[in-house]
Amino acid sequence: RIKKFDFNKEYTHVKSYWRKYVKEDNGLELKEPTNSYEEKIQDIYRRSILLFPLLTNQTTGGVIAAPEVDEELTQCGRYGYCWPRDAIFIAKALDILKMTKETEKFYSNFCRMTQSKNGMWEQRFYTDGKLAPCWGYQVDETASVVYGVYSHYEYTKNEEFLKANLHMCEKAIDFLKKYVKDILEKTGIYHVSYDLWEMYEGIHLYSLASIFSAFDSMIKIYGVLGKNISDFENNRLKEEKISKSIDEMSNLKIEIKKYIDENLYDENRKSYVRNADDKRIDISLLGAVVPFKVFSPKEKRVLNTVENINLTIRTYTGGYQRFEYDHYRNGAPWPIANLWMTLYYLENGEKKKAKETFDFVLKTAGKHSFLGEQIDNNTLKPNWVIGLGWSHAMFVIVLEKLNKM
């Protein structure tokens, strides 16, 4: 049977299949490149389109963080799990590419099957929905799911999707309300969560920003559905409960913003800090602007923070580290960090600076146009895990923003 295998025929068939796949999923409708700069962008863009389905469990909708070649998960990056946070960014990229069925399966199937009884999501899962080894939950993952559900609606305008996932979101919101009240009232009932880098426990600005956005998204979900919520139509008790919840979330949004300003802004450094205890500058501080919109990009404190980011975690090559004194794998720059800076600069209308931070990602992509988790500052080549879904998702999100300008 091996002798009868026509390699050239099979190669042509596979090549044709994936070329058709890329063409059909060119959601941004990018035109053919006219120069080497545009060609580089197209190469990474196409690679992203090809990468996402390879990370996705087509049955459950679960999305792993990066390709994992070791089935025992001991010799590689151990990234063959689904982190809700990473997956939410990838889901947004899928929506941009008009792969909306894949996004809907992630939320309507995978997220619903993995939600805990108390409304939260644990740190990470196998793509079949089973709980993976965990060492500490991150509250931003729970908040990000609610944010992501409404984000998906913004692309599809599918009210049935919102109705189908309403109960899931309400359970998550109930958990987040209790978590925030615990912080504000200092009751100590809920254990503080880890940060998005899974390294430090505490009350983190990024986490609070994600919760702010979850409340905002839930208010908008109720606004879209109005009184036309399946199973609750003409139910006065349900309407009263929703009205009360909206008021409560609106007040908690105000309290979160107040807490951040009073506890997570360092007057000496003239900067927001990631945590009240360690007060380090962190690229995730930008999350309060994009995507979570707690602050506008032009607010004085935000501008001061961006200046501090450039002074502390921008390296001599133009790449950005995750945070001050980041020693993980020698504190290399992360494409995610550069792309986050790019998104901020685009939000603030600073196109020249946006191009500078974006170009670093272009010139450090691998020879097959994969984006790594990190960049070696000496060789300017991808370092550690290569083909990181979050990096490629952020790249697509940046391209969408550029296309709208």
Specify the residue positions occupied by each region the protein language model found:
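C-terminal capping/lid segments that line or modulate ligand- or cofactor-binding pockets
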Residues: 79, 90, 125-127, 132-155, ...
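Long, well-ordered core segments of solenoidal/helical folds
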Residues: 50-59, 98-121, 165-187, 238-241, ...
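Extended ligand-binding clefts on enzyme/binding-domain cores
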Residues: 44, 204-210, 232-336
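Aromatic-rich carbohydrate-recognition surfaces in CAZymes
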Residues: 14, 79-183, 208, 212, ...
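Active-site acid/base region of carbohydrate-active enzymes
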Residues: 30-61, 110, 114-120, 134, ...
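Acidic/His metal-coordination segments adjacent to aromatic residues that form catalytic metal sites
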Residues: 69-76, 121-137, 182-203, 263-267, ...
